[in-house]
From Swiss-Prot:
One of its GO terms (cellular component) is cytosol. It comes from the Bacteria. This is UPF0246 protein VC_2355. It comes from Vibrio cholerae serotype O1 (strain ATCC 39315 / El Tor Inaba N16961). It holds the Pfam family H2O2_YaaD. InterPro entries: YaaA (IPR005583). One of its GO terms (biological process) is response to hydroperoxide. Belongs to the UPF0246 family. Coiled coil: none annotated.
Length: 257
């Protein structure tokens, strides 16, 4: 079972991490190409392209300038600890055991606009480049055209290496659009998380993102191997709803918080 999640805009390069083990990201030649494009952008260009404040634009212009093709624990940190958005609040990577991290290294992948695909212990230099960014490049008008089938091929390698053909899609639509399902050698299963609000169950972004991280942790901690076993997920009050689920979409609901 291979899990894919989105990255996060919020990063943490300060908090202590639980391991000094790391691996090198595998698609850095492609990342370096994107960095060269990004280095041609002014702070105002970045602000307009990414719809961010002048301050955040300036920060990322500096990050692009400082980015190096050599990744060390001095200029980078393991991706699973560097990302700190809602998904990662749910994942709580800092409390995973060494054995959990070993399992995650084989079974969890983070999609990324700059790095393509990251394993949990892959070193990552700080950046901001969301997959939906319309960054013109030598391969096309945006990052989907830049990455083409590279991300899909990398996921296929991971699927083959870990021994079955189930991919659990816990990524956002923006990121999973970078994957070509027709070329993916896997059955795709997408968990859907709905929270009660004013008497109706709906997908509430903040809760759904956190739930995706909690589901990833559930799979890692329990060494889940089958789609059937995903139905047992009950973290934070969620429960499986068989009547609304299909073989490709598993629906989980929770009462109003």
């Amino acid at each position: 079972m291979l899990i894919v999640v989105s990255p996060a805009k919020t990063l943490d390069y300060e908090s202590p991490v639980s391991t000094s083990n790391f691996t090198q990201p595998e698609l850095t030649a492609h990342s370096a190409e994107l960095i060269q494009v990004c280095r041609t952008l002014s702070s105002q260009d970045v602000s307009e392209l990414m719809s961010v404040s002048d301050k955040i634009a300036g920060l990322n212009v500096a990050r692009f300038a400082q980015w190096s093709e050599t990744f060390t624990l001095d200029n980078a940190r393991q991706a699973i600890f560097a990302f700190k958005g809602d998904v990662y609040t749910g994942l709580e990577a800092e409390t995973l055991s060494p054995q959990d991290l070993d399992f995650a290294q084989q079974h969890l992948r983070m999609l990324s606009g700059l790095y393509g695909v990251l394993r949990p212990l892959d070193l990552m230099q700080p950046y901001r480049l969301e997959m939906g960014t319309k960054l013109a490049n030598a391969r096309g008008a945006n990052l989907y055209q830049f990455w083409g089938d590279i991300i899909t091929e990398k996921l296929n390698q991971a699927i083959e290496a870990q021994g079955d053909n189930v991919l659990v899609n816990l990524a956002s639509n923006e990121y999973f659009k970078a994957v070509n399902p027709k070329r993916l050698n896997a059955q795709i299963v997408t968990p859907i998380f709905k929270d009660a609000k004013n008497g109706q169950y709906k997908i509430i972004s903040f809760f759904a993102k956190k739930a995706r991280g909690m589901m990833a942790r559930y799979i890692i901690e329990n060494r889940i191997k089958s789609v059937k076993d995903l139905e047992g997920f009950n973290t934070a009050g969620y429960y499986f709803v068989a009547s609304e689920s299909t073989p490709t979409e598993l629906v989980f609901k929770r009462e109003e918080q």
